[in-house]
Amino acid sequence: MYLLIPAAGMGKRMGSNRNKLLLTLLGKPLLSWTLLAAEASQKIEWVGIIGQPYDFPEFKTILTTISFTKPVELIQGGETRQASVYNGLQALPKAADNVLIHDGARCLVTPDLFDRCAEELLTCQGLIAAISVKDTIKIVDSNQFIKDTPNRSNLWAAQTPQGFKVSLLKQCHEKGYQLGWQVTDDAALFEKCQLPVKIVEGEETNLKVTTPVDLAIAEFILKQRFTH
């Protein structure tokens, strides 16, 4: 299985002007933890890290420090996540039929989740890891008044990895570019192209580290893993 990791995010909500994946979590950059899970995965054979060239020296240092053994390529990202993933798709080895895309900021992902998604992708065209929503969700108008309360049993919170047939995802990206679609994940492109996307049970601990509170929670979860 081939894995693309978008890793170009700035840590503005962290109060930082540098790439948030280079911020430290238990003595290692966030990106290290994501890569360690990829290294331990039984299914992932190749990794592409999508970022900006000025971060590449630090990415290389991370790969050396954690003794990453799988083939890896550093790929220049675009102005948006969507553009970055498109660049990543173009850089995949020709042999790649299927691809997993995983946000580098979801640094608590486990090797098991990578492997389950990789296995499931052999039986479908597209999938995402997701968890059922526990909170009641409200839809509001521009004045912050509630318009509707959707049925919680139909709501799932999207995570990554998200996996797709490479040829289909390339077509979706090209169509999205031509029609000016702007989406926040690749599953949305698949949906707009009327293609099916399956849910794979994600992990509650697979949070996206975006704020200082997220960082503190991630630290707690990692410490629990090490003590058990």
Curated annotation (Swiss-Prot):
It is an enzyme of class 2 (transferase). The keyword Ligase does not apply. Belongs to the IspD/TarI cytidylyltransferase family. IspD subfamily. Catalyzes the formation of 4-diphosphocytidyl-2-C-methyl-D-erythritol from CTP and 2-C-methyl-D-erythritol 4-phosphate (MEP). This is 2-C-methyl-D-erythritol 4-phosphate cytidylyltransferase. The record marks 13, 20 as: Transition state stabilizer. Its EC number is 2.7.7.60. GO terms for molecular function: 2-C-methyl-D-erythritol 4-phosphate cytidylyltransferase activity. CDD domains: CDP-ME_synthetase (cd02516). The keyword Nucleotidyltransferase applies. Keywords: Isoprene biosynthesis, Nucleotidyltransferase, Transferase. It comes from Crocosphaera subtropica (strain ATCC 51142 / BH68). Transmembrane segments: none annotated. It catalyses: 2-C-methyl-D-erythritol 4-phosphate + CTP + H(+) = 4-CDP-2-C-methyl-D-erythritol + diphosphate. InterPro entries: IspD (IPR001228), IspD/TarI (IPR034683), IspD/TarI_cytidylyltransf_bact (IPR050088), ISPD_synthase_CS (IPR018294), Nucleotide-diphossugar_trans (IPR029044). The record marks 152, 208 as: Positions MEP for the nucleophilic attack. SUPFAM superfamilies: Nucleotide-diphospho-sugar transferases.
